[in-house]
Swiss-Prot record:
<dbReference type="Pfam" id="PF06052">
    <property type="entry name" value="3-HAO"/>
</dbReference>
<dbReference type="GO" id="GO:0034354">
    <property type="term" value="P:'de novo' NAD biosynthetic process from L-tryptophan"/>
</dbReference>
<protein>
    <recommendedName>
        <fullName>3-hydroxyanthranilate 3,4-dioxygenase 2</fullName>
        <ecNumber>1.13.11.6</ecNumber>
    </recommendedName>
</protein>
<feature type="binding site">
    <location>
        <position position="108"/>
    </location>
    <ligand>
        <name>Fe cation</name>
    </ligand>
</feature>
<dbReference type="GO" id="GO:0046874">
    <property type="term" value="P:quinolinate metabolic process"/>
</dbReference>
<feature type="binding site">
    <location>
        <position position="50"/>
    </location>
    <ligand>
        <name>Fe cation</name>
    </ligand>
</feature>
<dbReference type="GO" id="GO:0005737">
    <property type="term" value="C:cytoplasm"/>
</dbReference>
<comment type="pathway">
    <text>Cofactor biosynthesis; NAD(+) biosynthesis; quinolinate from L-kynurenine: step 3/3.</text>
</comment>
<keyword id="KW-0223">Dioxygenase</keyword>
<dbReference type="GO" id="GO:0000334">
    <property type="term" value="F:3-hydroxyanthranilate 3,4-dioxygenase activity"/>
</dbReference>
<keyword id="KW-0479">Metal-binding</keyword>
<keyword id="KW-0408">Iron</keyword>
<keyword id="KW-0662">Pyridine nucleotide biosynthesis</keyword>
<dbReference type="GO" id="GO:0043420">
    <property type="term" value="P:anthranilate metabolic process"/>
</dbReference>
<dbReference type="GO" id="GO:0008198">
    <property type="term" value="F:ferrous iron binding"/>
</dbReference>
<keyword id="KW-0560">Oxidoreductase</keyword>
<feature type="binding site">
    <location>
        <position position="70"/>
    </location>
    <ligand>
        <name>substrate</name>
    </ligand>
</feature>
Length: 188
């Protein structure tokens, strides 16, 4: 059996601050069989919306609810969680010391400000699950959120897998052109 010891959060932050850098600012603290716990710093440099599809329907509560949520806890400073809810953009402020449980399969964009730190907990992804990074047009006069680009992948390591996808988006202007209105989205 492995020896279990508590983690000194203050010491860990002092020794690992460099791991919480753009564009993702994410470091995996724990990866078990059931869940992943990540430390996330700010500021981040991304405008994508992440969709985690590891969905399992519950028999209790309401039949349409899922148990594959993402848990956010804001340790230091405030953040903003942009989501798409009922086919509409919505901003959810999460203040220092607050927690938020995001329903599964909700497109979300965590906006982290300078000198902020949070914890995020997610379920492990089954081999058949697919994550998505989506970019939406925010410049055209669209009636509902309009996807410009979507990358689909199996996520085994969020911290390392998101960075090259985000960097491709930022570097390729033509991939940021909206197919409906022709506007070019900002890289960040």
């Amino acid at each position: 059996m492995a020896t279990l010891n508590p983690l000194s959060w203050v010491t860990w932050l002092a020794e690992n601050e460099d791991k919480l850098r753009p564009p993702v600012n994410n470091y995996c603290l724990y990866q078990g069989n059931d869940f992943i716990l990540m430390a996330v710093g700010g500021p981040n440099e991304r405008n994508d919306y992440h969709v985690n599809e590891t969905e399992v329907r519950l028999q209790w509560h309401q039949p349409s609810e899922t148990n594959e949520q993402e848990w956010f806890y804001q340790v230091q400073g405030d953040m903003l969680l942009r989501v798409i809810e009922n086919d509409t953009f919505r901003d959810i402020p999460i203040k220092e010391g607050e927690m938020f449980l995001l329903p599964g399969n909700t497109p979300h964009n965590p906006v982290r400000y300078k000198d902020t730190i949070g914890l995020v907990m997610e379920r492990q992804r089954p081999a058949e699950s697919r994550d998505r990074l989506r970019w939406y047009c925010t410049k055209g006069n669209h009636c509902s959120p309009t996807i410009i680009r979507e990358e689909v992948f199996h996520c085994a390591d969020l911290g390392s897998q998101l960075k090259p996808i985000i960097e491709r988006w930022q570097q390729d202007e033509e991939s940021r052109r909206c197919g409906e209105c022709g506007c070019i989205a900002d890289p960040k």
